Amino acid sequence: MSATFTLGQLAERLGATLRGAEAKVITGLATLQEARPEQLSFLANAQYRKFLAQTQAGAVLLSAADAEGYAGDALIVANPYLAYAQLSHLFDRKPKAAPGIHATAQVADDAQVDPSASVGPYAVIESGARIGAEVSIGAHCVVGARSVIGDGGWLAPRVTLYHDVQIGKRVVIQSGAVIGGEGFGFANEKGVWQKIAQIGGVTIGDDVEIGANTTIDRGALSDTLIGNGVKLDNQIMIAHNVQVGDNTAMAGCCGISGSTKIGKNCMIAGGVGMVGHIEVCDNVFVTGMTMVTRSITEPGAYSSGTAMQPAGEWKKSAARIRQLDEMAKRLRELEKQLAAVTQTANVSSDA
Protein backbone atom coordinates (compact mmCIF):
# COMPACT_ATOMS: atom_id res chain seq x y z
CA MET A 1 0.00 0.00 0.00
CA SER A 2 1.28 3.46 -0.90
CA ALA A 3 2.23 5.89 1.86
CA THR A 4 0.11 9.02 2.20
CA PHE A 5 1.02 12.40 3.64
CA THR A 6 -0.57 15.81 3.66
CA LEU A 7 1.20 18.81 2.22
CA GLY A 8 1.32 20.22 5.71
CA GLN A 9 3.16 17.16 7.00
CA LEU A 10 5.66 17.29 4.15
CA ALA A 11 6.25 21.00 4.67
CA GLU A 12 6.92 20.40 8.35
CA ARG A 13 9.44 17.64 7.56
CA LEU A 14 11.32 19.90 5.18
CA GLY A 15 10.94 23.18 7.01
CA ALA A 16 9.42 24.42 3.75
CA THR A 17 7.12 27.36 3.13
CA LEU A 18 3.74 25.94 2.17
CA ARG A 19 1.69 27.75 -0.41
CA GLY A 20 -1.62 26.00 -0.90
CA ALA A 21 -3.94 23.53 0.81
CA GLU A 22 -2.34 22.16 3.96
CA ALA A 23 -4.71 19.17 4.06
CA LYS A 24 -4.12 18.08 0.45
CA VAL A 25 -3.13 14.40 0.40
CA ILE A 26 0.01 13.31 -1.47
CA THR A 27 0.51 9.63 -2.32
CA GLY A 28 3.73 9.68 -4.33
CA LEU A 29 6.38 11.47 -6.37
CA ALA A 30 6.65 11.95 -10.13
CA THR A 31 8.20 14.13 -12.81
CA LEU A 32 6.53 17.35 -13.90
CA GLN A 33 5.48 15.69 -17.16
CA GLU A 34 3.97 12.56 -15.59
CA ALA A 35 2.67 13.68 -12.18
CA ARG A 36 -1.00 13.20 -11.31
CA PRO A 37 -3.05 15.45 -9.00
CA GLU A 38 -2.28 13.27 -5.96
CA GLN A 39 1.47 13.36 -6.56
CA LEU A 40 4.26 15.78 -5.66
CA SER A 41 6.83 16.90 -8.23
CA PHE A 42 9.90 19.14 -8.23
CA LEU A 43 11.80 21.56 -10.44
CA ALA A 44 15.55 21.37 -9.97
CA ASN A 45 16.86 21.83 -13.51
CA ALA A 46 16.14 24.89 -15.64
CA GLN A 47 15.70 22.81 -18.79
CA TYR A 48 12.50 21.34 -17.29
CA ARG A 49 10.99 24.72 -16.44
CA LYS A 50 8.98 24.57 -19.68
CA PHE A 51 6.89 21.75 -18.17
CA LEU A 52 5.94 23.66 -15.01
CA ALA A 53 2.95 25.60 -16.34
CA GLN A 54 1.23 22.48 -17.69
CA THR A 55 2.02 20.01 -14.90
CA GLN A 56 -0.88 18.13 -13.31
CA ALA A 57 1.03 17.64 -10.05
CA GLY A 58 -0.84 18.28 -6.82
CA ALA A 59 2.08 20.39 -5.65
CA VAL A 60 5.63 21.17 -6.72
CA LEU A 61 8.87 21.59 -4.79
CA LEU A 62 10.18 24.97 -5.97
CA SER A 63 12.81 27.55 -5.22
CA ALA A 64 11.51 30.99 -4.25
CA ALA A 65 12.41 32.35 -7.69
CA ASP A 66 10.52 29.64 -9.59
CA ALA A 67 7.54 29.84 -7.22
CA GLU A 68 6.90 33.45 -8.27
CA GLY A 69 5.84 32.35 -11.73
CA TYR A 70 3.74 29.36 -10.68
CA ALA A 71 0.10 29.61 -9.62
CA GLY A 72 -0.38 26.10 -8.21
CA ASP A 73 0.31 24.66 -4.76
CA ALA A 74 3.98 24.62 -3.85
CA LEU A 75 6.48 23.74 -1.17
CA ILE A 76 9.10 26.48 -1.34
CA VAL A 77 12.60 25.39 -0.36
CA ALA A 78 16.18 26.51 -0.88
CA ASN A 79 17.16 23.35 -2.76
CA PRO A 80 14.31 21.49 -4.49
CA TYR A 81 16.49 18.56 -5.53
CA LEU A 82 17.72 18.00 -1.98
CA ALA A 83 14.13 18.24 -0.72
CA TYR A 84 13.07 15.64 -3.28
CA ALA A 85 15.89 13.37 -2.10
CA GLN A 86 14.77 13.70 1.51
CA LEU A 87 11.13 12.94 0.73
CA SER A 88 11.87 10.06 -1.64
CA HIS A 89 12.45 7.70 1.28
CA LEU A 90 8.91 8.27 2.53
CA PHE A 91 7.51 6.76 -0.66
CA ASP A 92 10.06 3.97 -1.16
CA ARG A 93 8.22 0.66 -1.63
CA LYS A 94 11.30 -1.52 -1.23
CA PRO A 95 10.29 -4.61 0.80
CA LYS A 96 11.61 -4.65 4.34
CA ALA A 97 12.87 -7.98 5.62
CA ALA A 98 11.79 -9.27 9.02
CA PRO A 99 14.50 -10.01 11.61
CA GLY A 100 15.68 -13.58 11.75
CA ILE A 101 17.58 -16.24 9.83
CA HIS A 102 15.77 -18.07 7.04
CA ALA A 103 15.58 -21.83 7.43
CA THR A 104 17.58 -22.41 4.25
CA ALA A 105 20.44 -20.05 5.17
CA GLN A 106 23.77 -21.57 6.19
CA VAL A 107 25.37 -19.82 9.17
CA ALA A 108 28.65 -21.04 10.66
CA ASP A 109 28.51 -21.99 14.32
CA ASP A 110 31.02 -19.31 15.30
CA ALA A 111 29.52 -16.55 13.17
CA GLN A 112 27.83 -13.72 15.09
CA VAL A 113 24.47 -12.47 13.79
CA ASP A 114 22.67 -9.73 15.72
CA PRO A 115 19.10 -10.79 16.65
CA SER A 116 17.70 -7.75 14.83
CA ALA A 117 19.42 -8.69 11.56
CA SER A 118 17.74 -10.48 8.66
CA VAL A 119 19.44 -13.29 6.73
CA GLY A 120 17.57 -14.32 3.59
CA PRO A 121 17.01 -17.65 1.85
CA TYR A 122 20.12 -19.65 0.88
CA ALA A 123 22.49 -17.00 2.19
CA VAL A 124 25.84 -18.25 3.50
CA ILE A 125 27.58 -16.73 6.53
CA GLU A 126 31.04 -18.22 6.95
CA SER A 127 33.18 -18.84 10.02
CA GLY A 128 34.00 -15.85 12.19
CA ALA A 129 31.81 -13.41 10.27
CA ARG A 130 29.97 -10.73 12.26
CA ILE A 131 26.64 -9.22 11.22
CA GLY A 132 25.57 -6.03 13.00
CA ALA A 133 22.22 -4.73 14.22
CA GLU A 134 19.40 -4.28 11.70
CA VAL A 135 21.48 -5.57 8.81
CA SER A 136 19.53 -7.05 5.90
CA ILE A 137 21.21 -9.79 3.87
CA GLY A 138 19.33 -10.82 0.74
CA ALA A 139 18.80 -14.25 -0.73
CA HIS A 140 21.87 -16.13 -1.99
CA CYS A 141 24.37 -13.67 -0.52
CA VAL A 142 27.75 -14.93 0.68
CA VAL A 143 29.56 -13.33 3.61
CA GLY A 144 33.07 -14.74 3.77
CA ALA A 145 35.11 -15.84 6.74
CA ARG A 146 35.92 -13.13 9.29
CA SER A 147 34.08 -10.47 7.30
CA VAL A 148 32.16 -7.80 9.19
CA ILE A 149 29.01 -5.88 8.23
CA GLY A 150 28.28 -2.84 10.40
CA ASP A 151 24.90 -1.82 11.79
CA GLY A 152 22.16 -0.90 9.34
CA GLY A 153 23.79 -2.45 6.27
CA TRP A 154 21.67 -3.64 3.35
CA LEU A 155 22.79 -6.30 0.87
CA ALA A 156 20.56 -7.03 -2.11
CA PRO A 157 20.26 -10.64 -3.28
CA ARG A 158 23.40 -12.32 -4.66
CA VAL A 159 26.06 -10.07 -3.19
CA THR A 160 29.40 -11.77 -2.54
CA LEU A 161 31.81 -10.69 0.19
CA TYR A 162 35.02 -12.70 0.25
CA HIS A 163 36.96 -13.31 3.48
CA ASP A 164 38.33 -10.44 5.60
CA VAL A 165 36.10 -7.71 4.20
CA GLN A 166 35.25 -4.94 6.67
CA ILE A 167 32.02 -3.07 5.93
CA GLY A 168 31.05 0.04 7.90
CA LYS A 169 27.63 1.18 9.06
CA ARG A 170 24.60 1.84 6.79
CA VAL A 171 26.32 0.51 3.68
CA VAL A 172 24.12 -0.41 0.69
CA ILE A 173 25.38 -3.02 -1.79
CA GLN A 174 23.38 -3.93 -4.89
CA SER A 175 23.02 -7.33 -6.57
CA GLY A 176 25.97 -8.91 -8.30
CA ALA A 177 28.60 -6.86 -6.49
CA VAL A 178 31.72 -8.78 -5.54
CA ILE A 179 33.86 -7.37 -2.75
CA GLY A 180 37.25 -8.83 -1.89
CA GLY A 181 37.99 -10.90 -4.99
CA GLU A 182 41.65 -11.55 -5.68
CA GLY A 183 43.56 -8.66 -7.19
CA PHE A 184 45.24 -9.01 -10.57
CA GLY A 185 48.76 -9.77 -9.38
CA PHE A 186 51.30 -11.86 -11.29
CA ALA A 187 55.10 -11.96 -11.63
CA ASN A 188 56.61 -12.84 -14.99
CA GLU A 189 59.38 -15.42 -15.14
CA LYS A 190 60.72 -16.10 -18.64
CA GLY A 191 57.34 -15.48 -20.23
CA VAL A 192 55.37 -17.48 -17.67
CA TRP A 193 53.06 -15.70 -15.22
CA GLN A 194 53.45 -16.67 -11.57
CA LYS A 195 50.50 -15.87 -9.31
CA ILE A 196 50.98 -13.51 -6.36
CA ALA A 197 48.80 -14.31 -3.35
CA GLN A 198 46.56 -11.37 -2.48
CA ILE A 199 46.79 -11.37 1.30
CA GLY A 200 45.23 -7.98 2.06
CA GLY A 201 41.53 -7.31 2.49
CA VAL A 202 38.98 -4.61 1.75
CA THR A 203 37.88 -1.93 4.21
CA ILE A 204 34.77 0.11 3.42
CA GLY A 205 33.64 3.08 5.51
CA ASP A 206 30.20 4.20 6.69
CA ASP A 207 27.32 5.35 4.46
CA VAL A 208 28.82 3.89 1.29
CA GLU A 209 26.69 2.74 -1.67
CA ILE A 210 27.97 0.16 -4.16
CA GLY A 211 26.08 -0.47 -7.40
CA ALA A 212 25.12 -3.66 -9.19
CA ASN A 213 27.96 -5.79 -10.60
CA THR A 214 30.65 -3.51 -9.23
CA THR A 215 33.82 -5.28 -8.11
CA ILE A 216 36.36 -4.20 -5.50
CA ASP A 217 39.47 -6.37 -5.32
CA ARG A 218 41.28 -7.19 -2.11
CA GLY A 219 44.71 -5.71 -1.50
CA ALA A 220 47.94 -7.48 -2.34
CA LEU A 221 49.41 -6.71 1.10
CA SER A 222 47.45 -3.91 2.80
CA ASP A 223 43.70 -3.38 2.33
CA THR A 224 41.91 -1.72 -0.55
CA LEU A 225 40.24 1.31 1.08
CA ILE A 226 36.88 2.94 0.35
CA GLY A 227 36.19 6.02 2.50
CA ASN A 228 33.05 7.20 4.27
CA GLY A 229 30.16 8.40 2.12
CA VAL A 230 31.58 7.10 -1.17
CA LYS A 231 29.01 6.40 -3.91
CA LEU A 232 29.89 3.84 -6.57
CA ASP A 233 27.58 3.27 -9.54
CA ASN A 234 27.02 -0.01 -11.41
CA GLN A 235 29.74 -1.99 -13.21
CA ILE A 236 32.75 -0.23 -11.75
CA MET A 237 36.07 -2.05 -11.37
CA ILE A 238 38.24 -1.08 -8.40
CA ALA A 239 41.60 -2.88 -8.49
CA HIS A 240 43.76 -3.99 -5.57
CA ASN A 241 45.07 -1.39 -3.13
CA VAL A 242 43.10 1.48 -4.63
CA GLN A 243 42.13 4.16 -2.11
CA VAL A 244 38.99 6.26 -2.62
CA GLY A 245 38.56 9.29 -0.36
CA ASP A 246 35.49 10.30 1.63
CA ASN A 247 32.38 11.44 -0.27
CA THR A 248 33.77 10.78 -3.73
CA ALA A 249 31.17 9.70 -6.31
CA MET A 250 31.94 7.54 -9.33
CA ALA A 251 29.55 6.84 -12.24
CA GLY A 252 29.14 3.57 -14.11
CA CYS A 253 31.77 1.61 -16.05
CA CYS A 254 34.83 3.29 -14.55
CA GLY A 255 38.03 1.30 -14.21
CA ILE A 256 40.57 2.23 -11.54
CA SER A 257 43.92 0.44 -11.79
CA GLY A 258 45.89 -0.87 -8.85
CA SER A 259 47.30 1.33 -6.08
CA THR A 260 45.79 4.53 -7.45
CA LYS A 261 44.67 7.00 -4.77
CA ILE A 262 41.62 9.21 -5.34
CA GLY A 263 41.02 12.10 -2.96
CA LYS A 264 37.95 13.35 -1.12
CA ASN A 265 34.87 14.97 -2.69
CA CYS A 266 35.80 14.00 -6.24
CA MET A 267 33.31 13.31 -9.04
CA ILE A 268 34.36 10.71 -11.58
CA ALA A 269 31.99 10.54 -14.56
CA GLY A 270 31.04 7.40 -16.48
CA GLY A 271 33.58 5.35 -18.39
CA VAL A 272 36.66 7.02 -16.89
CA GLY A 273 39.83 4.95 -16.83
CA MET A 274 42.77 5.56 -14.51
CA VAL A 275 46.19 3.95 -14.78
CA GLY A 276 47.79 2.50 -11.68
CA HIS A 277 50.04 4.08 -9.05
CA ILE A 278 48.87 7.67 -9.54
CA GLU A 279 47.23 10.14 -7.14
CA VAL A 280 44.22 12.37 -7.68
CA CYS A 281 43.87 15.24 -5.20
CA ASP A 282 40.65 16.32 -3.44
CA ASN A 283 37.82 18.16 -5.26
CA VAL A 284 38.55 16.93 -8.78
CA PHE A 285 35.88 16.45 -11.48
CA VAL A 286 36.81 14.06 -14.30
CA THR A 287 34.45 14.16 -17.29
CA GLY A 288 33.07 11.05 -19.00
CA MET A 289 35.36 8.64 -20.88
CA THR A 290 38.50 10.49 -19.79
CA MET A 291 41.72 8.47 -19.62
CA VAL A 292 43.76 9.62 -16.64
CA THR A 293 47.40 8.69 -17.26
CA ARG A 294 49.19 10.82 -14.67
CA SER A 295 48.58 12.25 -11.21
CA ILE A 296 46.26 15.24 -10.76
CA THR A 297 47.63 17.67 -8.18
CA GLU A 298 45.27 20.65 -8.54
CA PRO A 299 41.49 20.72 -7.94
CA GLY A 300 39.32 21.38 -11.00
CA ALA A 301 37.74 19.72 -14.04
CA TYR A 302 39.73 17.45 -16.36
CA SER A 303 38.89 15.88 -19.73
CA SER A 304 40.49 13.91 -22.55
CA GLY A 305 39.37 12.68 -25.96
CA THR A 306 37.10 14.42 -28.45
CA ALA A 307 33.43 15.29 -28.08
CA MET A 308 30.75 13.95 -30.41
CA GLN A 309 30.46 15.46 -33.90
CA PRO A 310 28.88 14.35 -37.20
CA ALA A 311 30.65 11.26 -38.54
CA GLY A 312 31.92 13.00 -41.67
CA GLU A 313 33.53 15.79 -39.66
CA TRP A 314 35.03 13.29 -37.23
CA LYS A 315 36.63 11.33 -40.08
CA LYS A 316 38.23 14.51 -41.41
CA SER A 317 39.51 15.37 -37.94
CA ALA A 318 40.91 11.86 -37.49
CA ALA A 319 42.67 12.10 -40.85
CA ARG A 320 44.23 15.42 -39.83
CA ILE A 321 45.40 13.93 -36.55
CA ARG A 322 47.32 11.28 -38.50
CA GLN A 323 48.95 14.09 -40.51
CA LEU A 324 50.04 16.13 -37.48
CA ASP A 325 53.51 14.60 -37.18
CA GLU A 326 54.35 15.32 -40.82
CA MET A 327 52.86 18.80 -40.55
CA ALA A 328 54.97 19.49 -37.44
CA LYS A 329 58.13 18.45 -39.31
CA ARG A 330 57.24 20.75 -42.21
CA LEU A 331 56.53 23.62 -39.82
CA ARG A 332 59.91 23.21 -38.11
CA GLU A 333 61.63 23.25 -41.51
CA LEU A 334 59.75 26.40 -42.51
CA GLU A 335 60.74 28.05 -39.22
CA LYS A 336 64.40 27.24 -39.91
CA GLN A 337 64.14 28.67 -43.43
CA LEU A 338 62.37 31.79 -42.15
CA ALA A 339 65.01 32.30 -39.47
CA ALA A 340 67.76 32.03 -42.09
CA VAL A 341 66.05 34.52 -44.41
CA THR A 342 65.44 36.92 -41.51
CA GLN A 343 69.08 36.70 -40.42
CA THR A 344 70.27 37.41 -43.98
CA ALA A 345 67.92 40.39 -44.26
CA ASN A 346 69.18 41.78 -40.95
CA VAL A 347 72.79 41.49 -42.11
CA SER A 348 71.94 43.32 -45.33
CA SER A 349 70.20 46.09 -43.41
CA ASP A 350 73.18 46.52 -41.11
CA ALA A 351 75.44 46.80 -44.12
Curated annotation (Swiss-Prot):
The keyword Lipid metabolism applies. Keywords: Acyltransferase, Lipid A biosynthesis, Lipid biosynthesis, Lipid metabolism, Repeat, Transferase. GO terms for molecular function: N-acyltransferase activity. Its EC number is 2.3.1.191. Homotrimer. Catalyzes the N-acylation of UDP-3-O-acylglucosamine using 3-hydroxyacyl-ACP as the acyl donor. Is involved in the biosynthesis of lipid A, a phosphorylated glycolipid that anchors the lipopolysaccharide to the outer membrane of the cell. This is UDP-3-O-acylglucosamine N-acyltransferase. It comes from Ectopseudomonas mendocina (strain ymp) (Pseudomonas mendocina).
